[in-house]
Amino acid sequence: MEIDILSLFPDYFASPLQATILGRAIKQGALSVRSRDIREFGLGKWKQVDDSPYNGEGMLLMAEPVVQAIRSIRRKKSKVIYLSPQGQLLSAKKSRELASCSHLVLLCGHYEGIDERALTAEVDEEISIGDYVLTNGCAAALVLVDALARFIPGVLGNQESAEYDSLENGLLEGPQYTRPRVFEGESVPEVLLCGDHQKIADWRKQVSLERTRERRPDLYLQYFYGNSACLSTQEDLPRIEVVSPKTFSVVLEVQDLRKAKKFYSRMFGKECWDGDKLFLLGKTSLYLQQTKETRGPTTVFIELETDHDFVRFLKRWEILGGELGEQGTGGFPLRQVFDLDGHIWVVSCVQK
């Protein structure tokens, strides 16, 4: 695999790409990484690559030098990636996907960013390594190279180790132990010494689930949702309890009352209805009002009792034709969903 990195600081990558596993992989020919200076394509005598933006402060990389730099190395099957906090969050799945590419061009941002016209013209995808801003995109490029390199045959000494690392199967990796058997009075779990590979595998899976639920509930719920049995009929959908300590009523404007009522009947149960009024729980009520043109989406916040209810709610919503939106960040089980009329439901569950 070949990777070209475009930045204003090509020397930034010298040490990381010469040492550790990446350096060994490059020496052995499993991976080729080249760092190129965007200033080589700068304009005029002074090789200008940046200018002040029209609509803000600071400096911005100009479109022409960036476009020329990309086109000088781009091939027919190249994939150009811009490292940006606005991009898709990097994951193990995305890293594995990128590792199958024959040639990647990684574009590092600098200053306040890059002229949008360069991104529109040449960039195939934007990737972020997290919800924070760095002084430049060089560190992000290194993170991406390191993450995807693990999935390139010949880079790791033991390729199987990549399959058991944290997040590879959507869960955090469980605890690891080596010699001595007892350290400061604490012993290695007996199951790891029994020699029964199936018992060990079951133990690893269980502690992995427990650790993920404790430390990353967002990942746990995502894993649980993706691996839960598919629900196909109304009878398969158990009742979901909604937490509502306060009194409130919500009016939703719908274009087809019969269709909307059917959707919510299957979501929350027919026994909850009184005419066009839906009782979610206790004093909480939802009114459906038919209108030819709605005044825009209404946002409803709903909190569920357990993480199992949270997963079932999302599964049921999707099966009945609702749309799943963005997943919350920061480890909190939160999801935005849309009903048949475009109204927004922000769904969460109680934190215990």
From Swiss-Prot:
Membrane-spanning residues: none
SUPFAM superfamilies documented for this protein: alpha/beta knot, Glyoxalase/Bleomycin resistance protein/Dihydroxybiphenyl dioxygenase
An example Gene Ontology molecular-function term: tRNA (guanine(37)-N1)-methyltransferase activity
Classification via InterPro entries: Alpha/beta_knot_MTases, Glyas_Bleomycin-R_OHBP_Dase, tRNA_m1G_MeTrfase_C_sf, tRNA_m1G_MeTrfase_TrmD, tRNA_m1G_MTases_N, tRNA_MeTrfase_TRMD/TRM10
Catalytic reaction annotation: guanosine(37) in tRNA + S-adenosyl-L-methionine = N(1)-methylguanosine(37) in tRNA + S-adenosyl-L-homocysteine + H(+)
Assigned keywords, A-Z: Cytoplasm, Methyltransferase, S-adenosyl-L-methionine, Transferase, tRNA processing
Principal place of residence: cytoplasm
Keyword Methyltransferase on entry: yes
Localization: Cytoplasm
GO CC terms in record: cytosol
Gene3D superfamilies attached to this UniProt entry: 2,3-Dihydroxybiphenyl 1,2-Dioxygenase, domain 1 (3.10.180.10), 3.40.1280.10, tRNA(m1g37)methyltransferase, domain 2 (1.10.1270.20)
Enzyme class label: transferase
Signal peptide as annotated in the record: none
Domain of life: Bacteria
One GO BP: tRNA N1-guanine methylation
Similarity annotation: Belongs to the RNA methyltransferase TrmD family.
Function recorded in the entry: Specifically methylates guanosine-37 in various tRNAs.
Assembly information from the UniProt record: Homodimer.
Name under which the protein is recorded: tRNA (guanine-N(1)-)-methyltransferase
Originating gene: trmD
